[in-house]
Amino acid sequence: VDNPLLAFGLIKRLRSDWLNVVYSEAASENTRELQAGFEALRQELPGLEDLEGAARALMRLQDVYALSVKGLAKGVFEPAGARSPLYRPGQPVTLSADDCFHVGKVAYDVGDYYHSIAWLEEAVDLFRLSYGSWNTEDLASLEDALDHLAFSYFMAGNVSHALSLSREFLRYDPSNLRVAKNVAQYEKLLEEQGTAELGPPRRPDGTRLQTRDAYEELCQRPGTQHPTPSLRCSYETNGSPYLLLQPAKRETVRLRPYVALYHDFVSDAEAETVKALAGPWLQRSVVASGEKQQKAEYRISKSAWLKDTADPAVAALERRIAAVTGLDVRAPYAEYLQVVNYGLGGHYEPHFDHATSGKSPLYRMKSGNRIATVMIYLSSVEAGGSTAFIYANFSVPVVKVRGDPRQAPWPTSGSTSTGRSFGSHVAPGPRTEAAPGSNSAARLQIQGK
């Protein structure tokens, strides 16, 4: 599913909405058959973790691309204040009030009031428009949205807004003693403290806050390279007999630092073969943390590793990489081919591909630190998905299907270089990735001593 909103809606419908329908009074006449059929499929349906992950993915897209929540609810991926959308799906998918409430509730449950306020505001607006009508699939109501939004504003320091929303709640449910008590407390606080309010809630600080702004700015304006007459396209053999009859198609993207894209590096059939081989083995990607490896919110993807013996297509791909780069990619000089799937809102925030600590698990391999990375796109995305080089201050957009090993000299990039030699002093710089849709890539890390 290319559209993240459609993916979220589908996961929510399968995980949450169906439960409400199957166990509703309207289904009582066919309860046994309906519930039996549902239970038979339940193990294959998305779980709560999937639904919450889809909601967090929408919030991640909201942040990285500065998207308007109101625009997202209308099915348009539009940066706040922009004149044109970043991405307009061929068939727009709108979000319901209940959808927006659920996204806001996921943020609310972890104390993230920056995101909960934006999504619950939209939920309240949409519930107000449809108040009085009832949708079988809705789990939430206007009262629920008002209640959660009021407390979000209170926790963010806006007591007067919390009071206003709580009073509105009581107009719909005047017998609710808890909310009535909240109103009394809010009124007392305003009497004691006055009407001075804190500013708007601040976005939660990430683990990579110092580079986050640069990363997101580059993702929002991908491929902004200044025209340079010296940049050109060429056919390259790199002195390899393997490339004599079918030279590599190289596009020089940047000279300082040097970055090139190789077009048509893999065929569609090869890409599908690699994805099919990796599919059954995909697991949540991990990052190095001291001597251990662990999951991290700044890397959201699934990955699998393929040996060159897995299929002739993998062996052929590695021979091609060796021919283009001039580097030995056989073990132990390179790791196995890593296939990565960036699903809904998948991304990898600023990071180094090489080890920065002597305790890294990489050193236990006794093959040296990483000196180069070849990255090949196996599929394309509808929008976004750029690779951003934050210290060099530029980004490279996804090349539609086929492949694009990247190359650059150090220390400005973490990707592979052609026709250059490296020593142990090599220090690749961080690279970042963010993808709003489903995207698969193959990566080959090369070691040096």
Language-model segments: what does each one mean?
Residues 1-403, 409-449:
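Fe(II)/2-oxoglutarate oxygenase catalytic core
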